[in-house]
Amino acid sequence: NNIEALYRCIEKIIRCAKKLGKLVVATGDVHNINREDRLYREIIVNQNVPGKGRHVLARYLSGSKKACKNLDNINKVINICEEQEVKTDNVLNKVLKYIYVLNRIKKIPITASNISSIYSVSKNSQDEEIFRGKDGDAEKLKAISTVLRKLNVANVVKEKDGIYELNGNYIESEMPVPGHIPNQFFRTTKEMKEEFEFLNDQELIKEIVVTNPNKIIDMLEEIEVVEYPDKPYSPIIPNSQETTINMVFEKAHSMYGDPLPRNIEERIAQEFYGDNILDLVKEKLKIDHPRLSDERLDEEFPSLLHEIIISGYDAVVDIMADKLKRESEMALDDKKVREDAKAALGGIIGGGFDVIYLIAQKLVKHSNDDGYLVGSRGSVGSSFVASMMGITECNGLPAHYYCPKCHYSEFNNEKGEPYSIEYASGFDLPNKNCPECKTLMIHEGNDMPFATFLGFNADKVPDIDLNFSGDNQASAHEYTKVLFGTDNVYRAGTIGTVADKTAFGYVQGFFEERLYDQLKIEAESYGLTVTGKDELKKKGVIKSFVRIPEVERIAVGCTGVKRTTGQHPGGIVVVPGYKDVWDFTPFQYPADDPTSAWRTTHFDYHAIDADLLKLDILGHDDPTVLRMLQDLSGLDVTKIDLGDLDTMKIFTGPEILGVDRYKLRGTVDKDGRKYCPTGTLGVPEFGTNFLLGMLEETKPTTFAELIKISGLSHGTDVWLGNARDLCTPNSEGKIEVPFKNVIGCRDDIMVNLIAWGMKPVKAFKIMEFVRKGKASKEPAAWAEHVKTMKEAGIPEWYIESCRKIKYMFPKAHATAYVTSAFRIAWFKVHHPIWYYCAYLSIRRDQFDIESMIKGADAIRAKIDEIDEKGSAASNKEIDTRETLCICLEMCERGFYFKNIDVEKSDGKKFVITDDEKGLIIPFRALDGLGDNVALAIVKARKEGPFISQEDLSTRGKVNTSAMEKLKALGCLDNMSESNQLSLF
């Protein structure tokens, strides 16, 4: 209703600013590219903003703490802004912003009456009342005070102790108007000019829309907001290269002796400096000893290679520089040659990644010193150097033996053939005594090329991901502050976006809200009261009137929109000491709390991952379970035999556990009978229904096959419709390819192709192409690879299997998972009560105490009851079923559960009974009790025994509902109700 007054205000501001020599620029506050996108923004804001849809500016102007907790900082920014901006719409907000600058108004929601009242009292005011004059705060304060007085007279605001607040009574009768989201789409120049047609001055319009914005652009300095260097800026650790070299050779010599076997010496050299290092040293050897025969040169090569490697980085650079000088036809500057030589080197040290390895080593050692194992993720396990530094337990060498006493090692059998031809994993090698000292040798190696981690010439940036115990993760995070300093480490920021299903709910909710508002207005016009929206939805009165296809169409526009910011669960970004965090990103505090222990990068970490090192210090249950098993047993879990035959048997059936598979629950056989085909329930990576099916079909008997199964289960289009069809009987009962030969992990492709005679570089390129699923995306390139494979004699079934693959799991990751799983499975077979205690304490959250304490039959009945519900079963019931399947197995093995004991139960963990045949259920297992109350009970019990139910409730902070559940279970039968004693 006041649009004309609004136009006059804008015109006054513009002309006043021009007289004062101010640069007036028309800007668009753009949130959308297209005009139609406004609906999407309105839907998103409607869901995410407290107050149902109030724009963030409206929340800021009203002093809402939800808008921003740094209002003073925003006000400072407003005050130092030199240019006067003319918004293309919603100019009222600009005026209100000016009023709020001096913090004189505590609360001004944007409503219809506010707009009308403010402009009705300000349209005839003097220019200085709207425009912030050049004479500073005195004039602005005078102008604002005048406006506030008029608002007060108009009953829009009220004054108390010098603070102006919105008059609540004035607002109660107001109905917020729809359309609270401004039109913030990206306007064309023509559309921008049309917005200012009310000025009736084409020259002025052109000036503020075209000329002045260009002047602003010309004033701006061109900057690179986010740098994109060749590799991340890493911290500096003094003597890192020397430390890395010494650490690796010290460990290698302790295992394989000194001098090292040639293949190990070469592997270390290639990982340190890239594949070219071998040819470089051979060339130097020939030049230095031109008269030696090829046979003699070959004999001398290992010792010279070792001498050069331990001499350090500079020695290798010198050799490369000499090579470049020899190959150049012109004289080269020494400084330039050394720079080129450094650039030509790859690998861990040659590429400058030794610091990253050392950091990972320090983090792992810190956790190990605290008593926790650390699992490796990704392909870092294929790095033999990482293995020697203790970063990973995986050994990437081919299958082999080594003697722990005299350090003899053996990679070939009596025929001179590599063990890796028959054994894909060294853990499957039969036991063998050392031929030198008769000591039982250790079998090792899982045949993983280093190229899968750092590329063929070790030219990729290493990404070392580690799985720490959830109990020790926070300690590992804090340790980075010790390593680098508090001001140099930040939690990696993330941006959460709207998922497709969430967007669908947003859209439906938006239209339901709109329908409810219309219904409410209509009802109130007749003096009727409308009940709450949720109640009307239940009755079917309120539901989206928009057709599902239209809802889906609109939801697409909302999908992927920024919803919130957060932090990576384990990502720590390291800013080196020679750089400043501001060179890369602002930072923020979680929940805007400056006292938070950690600060978070404001930019999503993906935006700066090329600039800064990100440490992935992730939490995982396996190290926690293994630590608890180690504490319970007193055994060193790293000494467990990964070739234990009894443990291997649980992957083909539960009989080794002493139970009948048809008394267990897991899945259903072809005749509809419930059973469990394996003994792997509760074994990480091997206990899900999908894995139970895979295990039943593949019947693995070796560690290598377990690794292959892990790779197959984590890949995409690798098992179903691919390997499964090759290794399981067809309609004629025939198997096309033995299971051990199918492709399971990405490393298998490179190893297999090399074994078939293909050059390593070609094999690597095909592996990279296949594992990324490019065969269907790049048919021309795939045709060339097919030609290469056919020329090498690769079977058709293998080529076709490669074609189908969309994603492949790294073998090192699978090996690390299977290693942890096998150790846990070993306890399940040989020390079951410790296993069940650790598993249920750490990995399960949902329990059914009533059936657990009654034994196997009651547990089986409860599982069947949940199964009968089918898809109607809740997530909680499904989780409970998983727990009960393990509990059933435990009871069938002759063990039992003891009810919650007020005097003996732990807060969170199961406790082994004195006869070591049962487990006492912890307090947290009681539905609705919660960890905090469970721990409070234990803490209060340590201070003194509970003398009554009243005492338990009071000191243990147990609510009435939980007390009733404890009574129903019979946990309180031996306790009086009150603290008072009865004399009668």
Regions picked out by a protein language model, each given a short descriptive name:
Residues 82-131:
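Short amphipathic alpha-helical interface segments
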Residues 119, 123-126, 132-158, 961-962, ...:
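Charge-enriched amphipathic alpha-helical scaffolds
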Residues 27, 43-46, 64-81, 88, ...:
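Noncatalytic, beta-rich nucleic-acid-contacting surfaces in large DNA/RNA-processing enzymes
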Residues 34-45:
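Histidine/acidic-residue-rich catalytic or RNA/ligand-binding cores of hydrolases
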Residues 206:
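Active-site microenvironment for binding and transforming phosphate-containing groups
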Residues 29, 213:
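Conserved, mostly hydrophobic/aromatic
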